[in-house]
């Protein structure tokens, strides 16, 4: 019997540093990477490319079931590959964001994408980045990490990120938006944002990204008995 490939799940709120951590771990371990947050955008873009009706659940389900998508991390940069083409920039447009909201509303589409995400589990292993990876998508994962940080620290990081890209931002407004999203995510009826019972909760508020990566890799290697 073939052994099931191991999964390391990295869950947590927006701005905690999940993306950076997952890319670093995927590169360090040479494992596959799943960015679950991009999945709905990728499906929406595929639907737009193939002129699939965004209001038709029946048309979207087969597209979701056979979505040809890969995530490749190179030198800390994540490439989203749809049908052999790098669409990392294209999935960030407002048109795609709006379409993603539409397709995510269909229960059968969500079920199809859940199965599609689980299909990323291949040897030698998978790093799964999301919000319910350890609780819903891969509840049997041998290594689960919940990466958190204070809302103030996450707002500060987001502000610096936006300023570096030339945007003028208001810290108090950013903080209010993050707190509102946290409340919505942590208290929703379906798949609330909570650590899995067997997850390592890692607070990155006062840690550098290098320290976070070091702690996470050390924990994963111990759990998986990796060299």
Curated annotation (Swiss-Prot):
Originating gene: cmk
Subcellular location field: Cytoplasm
Lineage: Bacteria, Pseudomonadati, Pseudomonadota, Gammaproteobacteria, Enterobacterales
Any one of the GO CC terms: cytosol
InterPro entries from the UniProt entry: Cytidylate_kin, Cytidylate_kinase_dom, P-loop_NTPase
Protein name according to UniProt: Cytidylate kinase
PANTHER family the UniProt entry points to: CYTIDYLATE KINASE, CYTIDYLATE KINASE/PANTOATE-BETA-ALANINE LIGASE
Family, per entry: Belongs to the cytidylate kinase family. Type 1 subfamily.
Organism domain of life: Bacteria
Catalytic activity: CMP + ATP = CDP + ADP; dCMP + ATP = dCDP + ADP
Any one biological process term the GO annotation gives: nucleobase-containing small molecule interconversion
E.C. designation(s): 2.7.4.25
SUPFAM superfamilies: P-loop containing nucleoside triphosphate hydrolases (SSF52540)
Biological source species: Salmonella paratyphi B (strain ATCC BAA-1250 / SPB7)
Pfam families hit by this protein: Cytidylate_kin (PF02224)
GO molecular function, a single term: dCMP kinase activity
């Amino acid at each position: 019997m073939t052994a099931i490939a191991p999964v390391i799940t990295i869950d947590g709120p927006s701005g905690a540093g999940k993306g950076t951590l997952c890319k670093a771990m995927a590169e360090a371990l040479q494992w596959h990477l799943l960015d679950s947050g991009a999945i709905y955008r990728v499906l929406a873009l595929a639907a737009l490319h193939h002129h699939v009706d965004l209001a038709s659940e029946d048309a979207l389900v087969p597209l979701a079931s056979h979505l040809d998508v890969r995530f490749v991390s190179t030198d800390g940069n994540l490439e989203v590959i749809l049908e052999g083409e790098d669409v990392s920039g294209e999935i960030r447009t407002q048109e795609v964001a709006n379409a993603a909201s539409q397709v995510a509303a269909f229960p059968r589409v969500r079920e199809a994408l859940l199965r599609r995400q689980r299909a990323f589990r291949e040897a030698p292993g998978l790093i799964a980045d999301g919000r319910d990876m350890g609780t819903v998508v891969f509840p049997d994962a041998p290594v689960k990490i919940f990466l958190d940080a204070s809302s103030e620290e996450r707002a500060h990081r987001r502000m610096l990120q936006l300023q570096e890209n030339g945007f003028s931002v208001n810290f108090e407004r950013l903080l209010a938006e993050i707190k509102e999203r946290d409340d919505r995510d942590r208290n929703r009826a379906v798949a609330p944002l909570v650590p899995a019972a067997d997850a390592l909760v890692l607070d990155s508020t006062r840690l550098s990204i290098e320290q976070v990566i070091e702690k996470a890799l050390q924990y994963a290697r111990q759990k998986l008995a990796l060299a």
